[in-house]
């Protein structure tokens, strides 16, 4: 299946149903009074995280999701039916952005997590709500309010503990193949990896971590060279980055300059990502003897101004790989994920009169005589009825 990590969708919540203007009509009851019911609330639009999904490709074809409108109120104080909600399932790790405002509405990081992205409109009120001692035959009603309408940008960001960085052909895919059951394509040409991939590294029965492999970066990636830097977003949730350096590039390039290019592209993309813990890992040490590899790695680290620990490995022959993985596991255990504050579910808001509507009702006080005749031929199309509009 094609990997798609960005999509745009339109969500439209249901409008609220209108209130009804109606009067009780029954034999031997000449003055039945108002019995117009309220409308129903409009349906909401929800997003739900599903761990069984791993791409947004479905939303390249289906881009519009609309909740059901609330039904209008009816006579005999019958309330309109509430509109049905719509639930849109997205992969775990999806970030939701409102295109109109640029606001991040939420991150779907847990299976089953739900996020309301479109609130249905409020119901309108029927004329029975307006009856009073001075207005026994009200012809007022309120219309339902429109539901929310939004254009949403969905961005899938992989959930991994460890992210891998490096130039093309640095050995990232070979490394993930050697430590996990993932089988990304490996070949002797640049940009063999075209889409991100995940691998689970199991250290024992209880300890494991997830590593993410993304396509390689080259100089000018921030300006669109190569595959660009858009895949770097998949590393934003990683706790540590492994910067793989080919200790002896086959193309004769300078390893120090290659490392600086990666750091520069990271800084151009995001200061936050550039500030993440980053470990230096020299790969392909099996191509030279141990002493030469150690001397070369030391020279490269000094030229970079690197003062922290670095690792020498061979992903192909798994030299030094196990020790590196155990150190990564220890780091992950010592630095657990900080639990983000769970999004609070919006509370159900009951309709409340505001000052404007109270004032309007007070101004509508009309004296009604006991012998006043009821309008027996009235129906909902009567143009003399008054409609009240309210806002949330």
From Swiss-Prot:
Annotated positions binding Mg(2+): 173, 193
Keyword check for GTP-binding: yes
InterPro entries on file: G_OBG, GTP-bd, GTP-bd_Obg/CgtA, GTP1-OBG_CS, GTP1_OBG_dom, GTP1_OBG_dom_sf, OBG_GTPase, P-loop_NTPase
Cofactors: Mg(2+)
Biased composition range(s): Acidic residues: 363-386
GO cellular component labels: cytoplasm
Pfam families: GTP1_OBG, MMR_HSR1
HAMAP family in the cross-refs: GTPase_Obg
Family to which the UniProt record says this protein belongs: Belongs to the TRAFAC class OBG-HflX-like GTPase superfamily. OBG GTPase family.
Protein name: GTPase Obg
Organism the protein comes from: Enterobacter sp. (strain 638)
Lineage: Bacteria, Pseudomonadati, Pseudomonadota, Gammaproteobacteria, Enterobacterales
Gene behind this protein: obg
């Amino acid at each position: 299946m094609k990997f798609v990590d960005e999509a745009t969708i339109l969500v439209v919540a249901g409008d609220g149903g209108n209130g009804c203007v109606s009067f009780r009509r029954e034999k031997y009851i000449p003055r039945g009074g108002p019995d117009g019911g309220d409308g129903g609330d409009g349906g909401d639009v929800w997003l739900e995280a599903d761990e069984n999904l791993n791409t947004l490709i479905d939303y390249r074809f289906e881009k519009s999701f609309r909740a059901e409108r609330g039904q209008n109120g009816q006579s005999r104080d019958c309330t309109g039916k509430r509109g049905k909600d719509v639930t849109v399932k997205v992969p775990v790790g999806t970030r939701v952005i409102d295109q109109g405002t640029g606001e991040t509405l939420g991150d779907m990081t847990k299976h089953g997590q739900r996020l309301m992205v479109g609130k249905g409109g409020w119901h309108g009120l029927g004329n029975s709500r307006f009856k009073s001692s001075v207005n026994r035959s009200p012809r007022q009603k309120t219309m339902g309010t429109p539901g929310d309408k939004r254009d949403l940008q969905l961005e899938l960001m992989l959930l991994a503990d460890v992210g891998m960085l490096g130039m093309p052909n640095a050995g990232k895919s070979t490394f993930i193949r050697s430590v996990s059951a993932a089988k990304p394509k490996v070949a002797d040409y640049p940009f063999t990896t075209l889409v991100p991939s995940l691998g689970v590294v199991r250290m024992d029965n209880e300890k494991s971590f997830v590593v993410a492999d993304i396509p390689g970066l080259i100089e000018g990636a921030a300006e669109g060279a190569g595959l660009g830097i858009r895949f770097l977003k998949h590393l934003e949730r990683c706790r540590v980055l492994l910067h793989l350096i080919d200790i002896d590039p086959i193309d004769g390039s300078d390893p120090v300059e290659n490392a600086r290019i990666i750091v520069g592209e990271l800084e151009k993309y995001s200061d936050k990502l550039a500030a993440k813990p980053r470990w230096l890992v020299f790969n392909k040490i099996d191509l030279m003897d141990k002493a030469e590899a150690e001397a070369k790695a030391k020279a490269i680290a000094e030229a970079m101004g690197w003062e922290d620990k670095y690792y020498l490995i061979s992903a192909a022959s798994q030299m030094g790989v196990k020790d590196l993985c155990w150190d990564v596991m220890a780091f992950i255990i010592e630095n657990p994920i900080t639990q983000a504050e769970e999004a609070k579910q919006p509370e159900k808001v009951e309709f409340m009169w505001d000052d404007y509507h109270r004032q309007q009702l007070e101004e509508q006080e009309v004296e009604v005589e006991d012998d006043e005749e009821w309008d027996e031929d009235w129906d909902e199309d009567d143009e003399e009825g008054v409609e009240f509009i309210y806002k949330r």
